[in-house]
Amino acid sequence: MGFDLYTIDFETYYDKEYSLSRMSTEAYVQDDRFEIIMVSCKKNDEPTQWFWSYEEEDYKTWLMERGIHRGAVLAHNMMFDGLILDRLGIPMPPMLLDTLCMAQATLKPHHRSISLDSCLKHCDSPIRKKGYVHNMLGRNLRSLTTQELHDYADYCVTDTDGTHWLFHYLKQRLPKSEYEIIDTTLRMYLEPAFDLDP
């Protein structure tokens, strides 16, 4: 691809009424209740790092210091993570990748669920998602103890490592031309535009 690969995962506040299962991704990210609890980021094959802050601007600074805006950025559901990058004011990276899209093409015809957890199990990954997110219903960042924050970070980092592993597993099953299609599809969602005739 010619770019450094950045794999990311955001963890955000949710509750029984305010969640991605009850509203559109756009409505969720634009809602006044939206809060980033943490983000994890893996550059190429380097160890995954995580970061938290009470201020959204700090997330932008942390991610851009790592050069995320100059690389290929990967997530499992980039429509969600990409909207957060846009909310933070991070320039859209030159390449967008999504293991959810890759799984849609390679696993969905034979496998009912393409959640990250299901994909990792189906592909016999040594990485397994952890269930700590279920303990976070209705919990915002300020409510977390130091131990809870670190437990959640372990979950977040595992998601990023799992996404990175899944990408390398699935890329053997997709032609390289599909990356451009995935990137274009994501940009039509994240950077919608009208082309008007002169």
Residue ranges and their predicted role:
Residues 1-2, 64-70:
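Flexible, charged surface loops at secondary-structure boundaries
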Residues 15-21, 30, 52-54, 64-65, ...:
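A short linear-motif detector with a strong N-terminal bias
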Residues 1-34:
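Entry/capping segment at the start of metal-dependent catalytic domains
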Residues 20-22, 64-66, 111-112, 168-170, ...:
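Surface-exposed beta-strand edges and their flanking turn/coil or helix-capping segments
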Residues 4-6, 71-72, 93, 192:
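The start of beta-strands in P-loop NTPase/AAA+ ATPase cores
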Residues 34-37, 41, 45-60, 71-171, ...:
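Active-site-proximal helix-loop-helix substrate-binding element of RNase H-like nuclease domains
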Residues 27-33, 41, 63-66:
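Short secondary-structure boundary/capping segments within folded domains
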Residues 16-19, 176-198:
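Common nucleic-acid-contacting/processivity interface regions adjacent to the catalytic cores
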